[in-house]
Amino acid sequence: MKRYDLRHLKDDFEPRMKEILGETHKANETLIFLFEIGDFTPIQRSADLVKECGYELYNSLKFNEVDWTIVVKK
């Protein structure tokens, strides 16, 4: 399991998330991403990106007032 905190990137987290998803990960490895949600549009964009990169979205939940967490697996 690997955790990636992308909150410091604010609304520009998608290029970094795509880069991470493009890296080689062990089979069935779980990845956890944290990012800022702002107006909630990043949630759908992140789900679309996960699917586009060939991963399965396991969980998506609000972490606190401004942060979101998603759990994905290859």
Residue ranges and their predicted role:
Residues 11, 31-33, 53:
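Short non-domain terminal segments
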Residues 1-28:
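An N-terminal amphipathic alpha-helical segment
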Residues 26, 41, 49, 60-65:
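Long, contiguous binding/interaction regions
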Residues 29-33, 46-49:
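Amphipathic, hydrophobic secondary-structure cores in small proteins
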